[in-house]
Design a protein with these regions (language model features):
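Membrane-interface alpha helices of multi-pass inner-membrane proteins
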Residues: 163, 189, 204-209, 232, ...
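Signature aromatic-anchored transmembrane alpha helix within multi-pass, membrane-resident enzymes
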Residues: 72-84, 246, 251-252, 288-294, ...
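Perimembrane helix-loop-helix junctions
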Residues: 236-244, 264-293, 372
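Membrane-lumen/periplasm interface segments of multi-pass, membrane-embedded glycan/lipid transferases
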Residues: 132-144, 300-372, 393
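Hydrophobic/aromatic-rich transmembrane helices and adjacent perimembrane loops
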Residues: 109-110, 224, 378-382, 399-426
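Transmembrane-helix motifs of polytopic, lipid-linked glycan transferases
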Residues: 171-195, 232-233
């Protein structure tokens, strides 16, 4: 960079782009979660980021931070810091989030863990409950013949790893440990890419460790922490470039593809495999492609294995590539979301908000390395772009999530590209001053604010869950009409040993209620106690259908 004015021009350009997108998001963000999160969380942090960007390049604004000492890191220091951070995140899982699985995605990890802990791939569902499978677990179930058994529709590796980890420690510690492993792997990648630049190594680790998204998701059981950790371990092995390390990376790839959703890891890995081809390493690239094709076929056929393990015949079109395309891919391709542009604007702004506030300018400064095709700079950038495009096309609405979780596995890419930007431009005082000031603002401003907001959002749902759990009845019907969020309170163990057993109202009829009353007592969760969190919409009244279900319950089985 030749002058201060160039960095000033970059930051002003970024500030103008963010201001325009933020204005568009404020006017057009879809209702419920996207609008709620943008207005209550992201917009306030974006305002702070805009202040930093507009002030960048001004010597008085950042001069004080240039006197901060340089940091030199080694593996021992990083590993010790990562271990300490893992313990703090483990504590935060309980202190901030009550170790409560807020979303259906998170609950299904708990559900699958209980299934796998019993030594099965799918738990048998008693015959008398099979007609009520959808009411017992409304979303994300494999559709096994006759509902004879059940397990989530997600790939199993995340829950399997959690099951194995739970044999030796608290399962809630697994994601903090994975986040710590990802940090060490990110530092290892930076050491290999920038062996002569301790500052670049420190910046890569800084971008990772001060990501509010990394911290928040590590305190949940979302699979995204695993995606990030496995991706960075994969890249660390890939960069070693030996036969053994490539074999290790391929093994990690098998786990990463089956972790949660098949699509995420291949989008990360494909640019690096193509990089091997462009470097003339055709055989190695071919081995990766062949192995990944086999892994894809294996995981696509996983429903067939689940059915066979339960002694069931798979339904036509359920297993294999044809079933995967018919049941998983085509619905996403055929049912397009007309709000794609608005959602992706909100998603990307949310991602920027939940990262270190210095990340975006550093990514802009890495463009020179990307343009020069230096080392793996292009594959790092291509992985980010591929994932954004794929998610915009396939699934622009993420629902719940701290930050933009569909980009979570690429945070390591962003951190390494930011390190490139630092290495190329750290000789400029204004760059050093901006990064240090923005990092301090992140550490003492945006991270505490976002953690407070996330904890405040989760707490009422955890309280509602405990309230429902204390209802003195064998079963409770939860009014899930008109709301995508009340239905998340319908959560049961796979062996149905929890009391009360919870059922979603919109899958039941008055005849079902009369039948269920022959098995025990029933209570009804009214909408009033469920409306514990304002989602930016009017309160949802009790529906006629829900009232009809309650009226159908014989007096002798009804509990209030």
């Amino acid at each position: 960079m030749k002058s201060t004015s160039e960095f000033r021009r970059i930051t002003l350009t970024l500030a103008c782009i963010i201001a325009v997108l933020a204005g568009a998001a404020a006017l057009s963000a879809p209702l419920l979660l996207p609008r709620l999160f943008f207005l209550r969380q992201d917009s306030l942090v974006l305002a702070g980021l805009l202040g930093l960007l507009f002030g960048a390049g001004g010597r008085p604004a950042f001069a004080w931070s240039r006197r901060l000492p340089a940091v030199r890191l080694d593996y021992r220091t990083v590993a010790a810091g990562a271990g300490a951070a893992a313990l703090l995140l483990w504590a935060g899982t309980y202190l901030l989030f009550d170790n409560y699985p807020l979303t259906r995605d998170e609950h299904m990890v708990v559900f699958d863990l209980a299934v796998f802990r019993s030594g099965r791939l799918a738990a048998p569902l008693p015959p008398e409950w099979r007609a009520y499978a959808a009411a017992l677990t409304p979303d994300f179930l494999f559709h096994l013949p006759g509902n004879a058994a059940w397990v989530s529709s997600y790939m199993p590796v995340n829950a399997m790893l959690r099951t194995l980890f739970g044999m030796i420690a608290d399962p809630a510690l697994m994601n903090p440990v994975l986040a710590a492993a990802g940090a060490v792997a990110t530092f290892d990648c930076a050491r290999r890419l920038f062996p002569k630049s301790g500052g670049a190594q420190a910046v890569a680790l800084l971008m990772y460790a001060t990501s509010a998204q990394v911290l928040a998701l590590a305190m949940t059981n979302y699979a995204m922490t695993g995606h990030l950790a496995l991706n960075m371990i994969w890249l660390s092995l890939y960069l070693r470039g030996t036969r053994a390390s490539h074999a290790g990376a391929i093994g990690i790839g098998f786990l990463a593809i089956g972790l949660h959703q098949i699509v995420f890891h291949p989008l990360f890995a494909l640019p690096f495999i193509d990089h091997l081809r462009r470097q003339g390493q055709w055989r190695t690239a071919a081995v990766y492609c062949g192995c990944y094709a086999l892994f894809g076929l294996f995981w696509i056929s996983y429903p067939h294995l689940v059915a066979l393990s339960a002694g069931l015949q798979t339904q036509t079109g359920m297993s294999g590539g044809g079933g995967f395309i018919t049941n998983r891919v085509l619905p996403l391709l055929l049912h397009r979301d007309h709000r794609t542009v608005q959602l992706m604007v909100v998603n990307l702004l949310r991602f920027v908000t939940w990262e270190n506030l210095a990340l975006l300018p550093l990514l802009a400064l890495s463009f020179g390395a990307i343009r020069r095709d230096e080392s793996i700079a292009r594959p790092l950038a291509y992985g980010i772009l591929l994932t954004i495009l794929a998610m915009a096309f396939l699934l622009p609405y993420q629902g719940h999530g701290w930050g933009y979780r569909y980009l979570h596995g690429l945070i390591g890419n962003c951190a390494l590209l930011a390190a490139w930007g630092w290495r190329d431009h750290c000789d400029r005082d204004e760059v050093r001053g901006f990064v240090r000031t923005a990092s301090l603002a992140t550490l003492f401003g945006s991270i505490p604010f976002l953690m407070w907001q996330a904890a405040a959002f989760v707490r009422p749902y955890a309280q509602a869950d405990r309230t429902i759990g204390r209802i003195n009845a064998n079963m409770v019907v939860i009014n899930a009409d008109y709301s995508d969020f009340r239905v998340d309170q319908v959560r049961n163990l796979p062996d149905l040993t929890n009391r009360p057993i919870r059922l979603a109202s919109y899958w039941l009829t008055p005849a079902d209620i009369r039948m269920l009353c022959s098995r025990g007592t029933i209570a009804f969760a009214d909408p009033g106690p469920m409306d514990l969190h304002d989602l930016g919409v009017d309160r949802v009244p009790s529906s006629n259908k829900f009232d009809a279900l309650r009226a159908a319950a014989p007096v002798q089985c009804l509990r209030r």
